[in-house]
């Protein structure tokens, strides 16, 4: 026989209070290398700003051609590793920049150089070559991810949870509209 479906409970989660000031936490330990993490708030998955933050994180720290790697590792030799990624999903997320300082580099020296890279990104329009390169990488990563049945099923479930399973077919258009 048929099993009747149950009622779907309303998902009501409180939003985190708005952060209005800069916060930092310094932890000192005896470790092989000094690590840093910068976290910036970003919109939830349903917001177009989510996709802009995703592209920005790729421009900043996806690979060896990224802005942070080129400037802070290759040119200035301030870090031994650096990257950027996002944590967003249903709720507001974070764009995180993290890595490890080279020996002898102070956090203040690194911080100044990092903010110079971020200010340049903020104040200058990204050229078409860089944007095209990022879009190709995003499309390629998505196509490889979609080859596996489990990944396709998980992505479909994610979009259904967001309220529109067809969003899986429309997401690439959002990226290309940036």
Describe each PLM feature range.
Residues 1, 53-63, 113-121:
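Bilobed periplasmic-binding protein/Venus flytrap-like ligand-binding cleft at the lobe interface
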Residues 1-44, 145-146:
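An aromatic/glycine/proline-enriched structural segment found at the starts
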């Amino acid at each position: 026989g048929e099993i009747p479906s149950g009622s779907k409970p309303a998902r009501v989660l409180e939003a985190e209070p708005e952060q209005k000031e800069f916060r930092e936490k310094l932890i000192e330990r005896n470790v092989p290398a000094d690590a840093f993490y910068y976290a910036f708030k970003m919109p939830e998955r349903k917001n177009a700003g989510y996709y802009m933050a995703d592209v920005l994180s790729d421009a900043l720290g996806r690979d060896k051609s990224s802005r942070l790697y080129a400037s802070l590792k290759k040119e200035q030799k301030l870090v031994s590793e650096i990257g950027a990624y996002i944590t967003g999903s249903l709720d507001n997320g974070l764009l995180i920049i993290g890595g490890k300082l080279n020996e002898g580099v102070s956090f203040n020296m690194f911080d100044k150089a990092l903010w110079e890279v971020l200010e340049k990104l903020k104040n200058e329009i990204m050229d078409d070559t860089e944007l095209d390169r990022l879009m190709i990488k995003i499309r390629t990563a998505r196509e490889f991810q979609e080859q596996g049945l489990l990944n396709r099923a998980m992505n479909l479930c994610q979009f259904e949870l967001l309220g529109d399973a067809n969003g899986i077919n429309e997401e690439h258009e959002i990226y290309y509209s940036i």
